[in-house]
């Protein structure tokens, strides 16, 4: 294999490489054996056409494309490795020569990893806005939240207040004409919940069951239904019932209803205090890690971040997001319809985040390289076992999904993050 690389501009160049006849000939033989099985040529049994007759009738060149498709991926990977390149985006491949009896010549326009000039990344001073201490108010807030979850709705005679639930019928119209989606019957609406467009719920406060209220609202300018956006509407709303939350007493019985593992309210408070302390400690560690890494990134200089890297990160993030939705039974079309957004909107949403994440990844990789971090076979095996446990998979499944190089990369990245974080101090 002959390999050369020519820099064209920052982080871009042309990689030229060859595929030798030593590789081409056996691949052409393999392709021919596969192709001849389906050939019907007069005078020969199906699948028994001799190679010289094939070459005479169709030309050896008829096999070239399939052979190239098979040989190119490994040849490109080998060329990148031999040239010592770190390619960060899909290449633009061009087959420049496929002459009979000659080595094939291919060029690839590639984008390479940008240079990272590291600044300080160890012994950093950082600020975090996360409290580690658990207060009585924290514990009481969590218990109150659980207490409210056990509340029952009880019909009340008095006028509706914020926090109450009303059961209503409503008919919406614009300039006296009803519109699609503007009607509902026996709808339970929590006042103050923000379920309906701004102003709707507020106008029901102070009214009682049996009353009919003309609710006048204006649809937001960015409302998903474009034909309604920015328009004033009237909703004739009849209140059937007003219900108030009735929360259970704050006692030992409540504690047992919330958590069957405790016997008293004091037990529940102690348990919640420990859980909140663990959660706050984890949040504090995450905040320190985030602040330290952000500082290391700010201290570094990246020489011209290629747009292709950002685009690939956006694409990866969007696919990951949509994949998570599909696992929940929501397909992309359904999501875009519900949210009134498009694929382009989603890409734009991830754009800024992708640029930041790409810079962060580059700096952490540069730290790992500068520190000479590596991963032993023992560490790789331990990582595989941990991933298998985390995702409830067999070890063999993880090994099939992730290559040793991918696992080694992840381990070295973790070591770099640990170095940046563990040496940081909080102001």
Swiss-Prot record:
Keyword Cell cycle included in the entry's annotation: yes
GO (cellular component) term, any one: cytoplasm
Domain PPIase FKBP-type stretches: 163-248
Record-listed E.C. numbers: 5.2.1.8
Disulfides per UniProt: none
Entries under Pfam families matching the protein: FKBP_C, Trigger_C, Trigger_N
Primary localization: cytoplasm
Keywords, in A-Z order: Cell cycle, Cell division, Chaperone, Cytoplasm, Isomerase, Rotamase
Cellular compartments annotated: Cytoplasm
InterPro entries: PPIase_dom_sf, PPIase_FKBP_dom, Trig_fac, Trigger_fac_C, Trigger_fac_C_sf, Trigger_fac_ribosome-bd_bac, Trigger_fac_ribosome-bd_sf, Trigger_fact/SurA_dom_sf
Domain of life of the source: Bacteria
Single GO MF descriptor: protein folding chaperone
Reactions that this protein is recorded to catalyse: [protein]-peptidylproline (omega=180) = [protein]-peptidylproline (omega=0)
Similarity field: Belongs to the FKBP-type PPIase family. Tig subfamily.
Comment on protein domains: Consists of 3 domains; the N-terminus binds the ribosome, the middle domain has PPIase activity, while the C-terminus has intrinsic chaperone activity on its own.
Function (record text): Involved in protein export. Acts as a chaperone by maintaining the newly synthesized protein in an open conformation. Functions as a peptidyl-prolyl cis-trans isomerase.
Name assigned to this protein: Trigger factor
Gene source species: Streptococcus pneumoniae serotype 4 (strain ATCC BAA-334 / TIGR4)
